[in-house]
Amino acid sequence: MRIALKSKRTISIIFSIVIALSISPNAFAVTPHETNIQIHQPIYDKIEAAILSILPEKEHYGLNDLNISELSLGQYIPSFEIVNNKLVPLDLYFYPIFDGENKVVSMAAITTVNGDTIVSISTAFVEQLQSIMPNCKVSIVYDSDGPYLLTQHTMIKLADYPMNMDFGRSNITAVNSSELQQANGVSLLGTKPLTPDLQIRPLGEDDDSIYLAVPKVLQPTGSSICWAACVASTVNYKYYGPGSAVYTAQDIADMYGYNTALGCAQVINTMNALFSNMQYTNNGGNNNNFPNIWSSLSSKDSPVIGRFEYSTGGGHFMVIRGMNYYGTFSVMDPLEAGATYRSGTITGTGNTRNFSIISYTGGSTLTLTHYGYKY
């Protein structure tokens, strides 16, 4: 069954301008632990553009029936990592998104990769943020085991890393409490309304975005079988339809006979052997990703199984299940339990482009390196 959300090829003048904006890396330059700053307009514009791109399925990003004019953006929540037993600021900024009652409903993450601005929208960590009083100052700290939400009084574990991954970080217990107090946070208050110009100007009759409602399948906590969760989600969607939960990640791992990390070729080839109706093509690298992924989603009603590389090293599989022709894509991440889907940014030109997305759990950027798709 095909359940896809599409929108006609329409785009506003302001949206085109927003997408075309470039952001200087200096826009992110702040002194360590500085939090009381204005939201830079180019950053605001990029986040606004990312929100506009997910409007056709906003319910998956915590926005539900909210009108975008009701939303506001808060000061960024600073993030840190523990490296060599020291607290070090991360070039990764989380902007909470608030509804009209000043409740956190979603969150934007933003960073730069090779001079390109990367924005992701997700509901990851939102449930924990909603439990924090507005006057509490919060920050996010990544150690060797996972991310933590820090306030003046509490430390909440947000997620766990995959097996055998520590992202080169030390354990938070190695840092004394006085140093952790330097991770100055911000209060959870909406400070800048989101006021995009939603007037649109038709450019044609073709569709400009496609989203497949693939089932959410999680990998077991602490495991490295993200690939199995992606196969389960894809097979469930193709064989049984949206929302189906016939196969789990562990079911697929048992069928493959592996409970360890695998390469993309083995994942795709074995899936084809086990499920004769799949017959996916494994791309040996990352070439021609833009037209191939677009075609697989829009023409073949087939999610793409993508192998991404962390900026800190190591790989992770996610299902590419949506794409907007003007620079965003959407994934099902089996590692993040707090979100159904997450958006990423497409940069570059031509047939081979950069598909980059921020890992809220890993505090790192993921970039597509291999993929399996329906030809």
Task: Tell what function each PLM region has.
Residues 3-14:
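Bacterial N-terminal signal peptides that target proteins for export
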Residues 13-22:
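Bacterial N-terminal signal peptides
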Residues 21-35:
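Sec-dependent signal peptide cleavage junction
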Residues 33-105, 113-125, 249-375:
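Conserved active-site-adjacent core of cysteine acyl-enzyme catalytic domains
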Residues 91-99, 139-141, 146-151:
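Short beta-strand elements that form the blades of beta-propeller/WD-repeat-like
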Residues 117-142:
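Primarily single-stranded nucleic-acid-binding OB-fold modules
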Residues 132-134, 153-261, 312, 343-344:
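Active-site-adjacent structural segments surrounding the nucleophilic cysteine of cysteine proteases
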